[in-house]
């Protein structure tokens, strides 16, 4: 048995429903995991509890997971030191004088997010740490900051030629049946497919329009109105106090450089360790015995794309913490006792996010894994529904986009969706183009748009899902209540997904990138004109009802 069929849908649906009903993400995730374990165990409560324990322990026993877990905790320690010394406050005050208004601070956050493209976790937490005080100064809602962070994480990483995401996609593409018939390298395939990644590119366009034209709608408009009228950066009545917010010290000793230096160190160390990890892994003790030989054995591009980002980020935060610790002591911004308190408070502030992250990994495992590995095999079940259906080539991109979005949203992982969908869709797309007798360029367009539909759907699901680790870390980086981030981002993500779906339908019909983008821009322009007006009209109607005698 490869899957549990429709039963696999229960855990993600239950988790998402409970999260919005109870406003308690941790309890909702726990009950979602438990429901999956009960299904896997055939209703046996003792076996379900044992499976639950194995899942939670397995999430932290995984080497990649534990390094990301430690990176997040130690980044919290760094943030604690930045706050304790007053460096974050000093930098925020300095930047607030340079960035005169909300538009400037949001655009600076957007640009910073584009620059830090090497890893989505690194992006969300680092950019959030730096830009949060500046956006707070200009009363930018935390939900808006979280949206910008989330939208410049996965959507940007999937477009960057050198990132932890690209190596994953290229490795799956390279090993997929039918790819060899295209006669191109995996990297060439990735580069040529970028224009077809409608969701990621439209998300970037959406951010710019929201920032410069202030075309907010839905729940985000309410967050903006709350910040403008009351100065509150999140709805404390609904979501309470944020436990991850670290109070900043009021001090005149810290300078803007005291904030910039640790962040620059983190970026430099991360960039340095990305290829270094590949070189270290290449040392086999026989043909390659040292770093110099390892570096000479591969190009810098190969070193970047074949690295293990979890090692690179973990080493980067360790070295950054050590240098920053000594630097602050030398600057007399804190003593040994204060440094210890800062590290402790910083790690403590990350505990809620770390618990949620562990739960998200666990529910992803029970949903994604096959029954032989103690999971439900939901992705396999959904993909089989498509494979068993009979449909023409033109509708394939739209179906693939929708299915990838559902899988990624339900499982909270885009990478898992890549692994499930690309090996299935590649041979289907190549086979259908061969059967249709398409010319080479048209056949290439068909394959590009089908695989880009997988990438776009997976990124949407990861972008919008409340159980996605990148969504969780964007909330953490912005110090925004997680459910407020989900509620405010969802309408934007769904709108961009609708634009992309229109593009994939049109692109599938004409097998042409220009027709796809024409459809995207028509739907996007119409929506950005109408949706803000609908939100204002709805708010006015509700206000009128409330004040009717």
What are these regions (language model features)?
Residues 1-4, 41-42, 97-98, 386-392, ...:
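Short, amphipathic, aromatic/basic-enriched membrane-interface segments that mark the entry/exit
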Residues 1-71, 198-200, 211-212, 228-362, ...:
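Hydrophobic transmembrane alpha-helices of multi-pass small-molecule transporters
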Residues 11-17, 109-113, 146, 203, ...:
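Hydrophobic, membrane-inserted alpha-helices
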Residues 33-34, 110-116, 130, 147-158, ...:
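Transmembrane helix-bundle signature of multi-pass membrane transporters/permeases
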Residues 45-146, 333-441:
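Membrane-embedded alpha-helical segments and adjacent helix-loop junctions characteristic
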Residues 72-93, 201-218, 321-335:
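Transmembrane alpha-helical segments in integral membrane proteins
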Residues 125-134, 458-473:
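Short helical (or helix-break) motifs at transmembrane helix termini and adjacent helical loops
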Residues 134-232, 246-258, 471-528:
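Membrane-core helix-loop-helix motifs of multi-pass transport proteins
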């Amino acid at each position: 048995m490869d899957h549990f069929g429709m039963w696999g849908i229960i855990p993600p649906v239950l988790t998402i429903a409970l999260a919005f009903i109870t406003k308690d993400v941790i309890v909702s995730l726990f009950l979602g995991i438990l429901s999956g374990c009960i299904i896997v165990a055939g209703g046996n409560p003792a076996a379900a509890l044992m499976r639950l324990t194995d899942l939670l322990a397995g999430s932290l026993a995984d080497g990649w997971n534990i390094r990301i877990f430690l990176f997040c905790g130690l980044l919290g320690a760094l943030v604690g030191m930045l706050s304790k010394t007053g460096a974050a406050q000093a930098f925020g005050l300095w930047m607030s004088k340079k960035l005169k208004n909300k538009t400037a601070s949001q655009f600076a956050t957007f640009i910073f997010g584009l620059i830090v493209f090497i890893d989505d976790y690194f992006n969300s937490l680092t950019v959030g740490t730096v830009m949060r005080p500046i956006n707070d100064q200009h009363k930018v809602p935390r939900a808006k900051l979280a949206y910008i962070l989330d939208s410049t994480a996965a959507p940007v990483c999937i477009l960057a030629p050198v990132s932890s995401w690209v190596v994953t996609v290229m490795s799956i593409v390279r090993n997929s049946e039918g790819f060899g018939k295209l006669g191109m390298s995996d990297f060439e395939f990735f580069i040529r497919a970028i224009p077809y990644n409608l969701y990621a590119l439209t998300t970037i366009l959406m951010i710019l329009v929201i920032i410069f034209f202030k075309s907010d709608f839905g729940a985000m408009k309410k967050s903006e109105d709350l910040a403008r009228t009351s100065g509150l950066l999140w709805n404390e009545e609904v979501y309470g106090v944020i436990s991850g917010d670290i109070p900043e010290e009021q001090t005149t000793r810290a300078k803007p450089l005291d904030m910039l230096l640790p962040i620059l160190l983190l970026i430099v160390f991360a960039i340095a360790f990305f290829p270094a990890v590949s070189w270290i892994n290449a040392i086999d003790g026989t043909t390659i015995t040292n770093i110099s030989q390892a570096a000479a054995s591969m190009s810098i591009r190969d070193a970047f794309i074949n690295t293990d980002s979890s090692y690179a980020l973990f080493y980067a935060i360790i070295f950054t913490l050590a240098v920053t610790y000594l630097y602050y002591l030398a600057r007399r911004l804190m003593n040994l006792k204060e440094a210890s308190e800062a590290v402790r408070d910083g790690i403590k502030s990350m505990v809620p996010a770390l618990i949620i992250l562990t739960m998200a990994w666990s529910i992803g495992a029970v949903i994604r894994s096959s029954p032989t590995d103690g999971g439900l095999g939901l992705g396999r079940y959904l993909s089989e529904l498509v494979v068993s259906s009979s449909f023409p080539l033109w509708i394939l991109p739209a179906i693939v986009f929708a299915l990838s979005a559902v899988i990624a949203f339900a499982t909270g992982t885009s990478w898992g969706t890549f692994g499930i969908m690309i090996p299935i869709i590649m041979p289907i797309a190549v086979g259908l183009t061969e059967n249709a007798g398409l010319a080479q360029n048209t056949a290439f367009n068909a394959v590009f748009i089908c695989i880009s539909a997988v990438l776009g759907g997976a990124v949407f699901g990861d972008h919008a899902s409340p159980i996605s680790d990148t969504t969780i870390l964007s909330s953490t980086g912005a110090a925004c209540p997680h459910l407020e981030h989900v509620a405010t981002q969802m309408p934007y993500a769904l709108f961009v997904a609708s634009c992309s779906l229109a593009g994939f339908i049109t692109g599938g019909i004409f097998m042409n990138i220009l027709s796809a983008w024409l459809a995207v821009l028509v739907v996007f322009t119409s929506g950005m004109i109408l949706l803000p007006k609908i939100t204002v009209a709805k708010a006015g109607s509700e206000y009128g009802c409330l004040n009717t005698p």
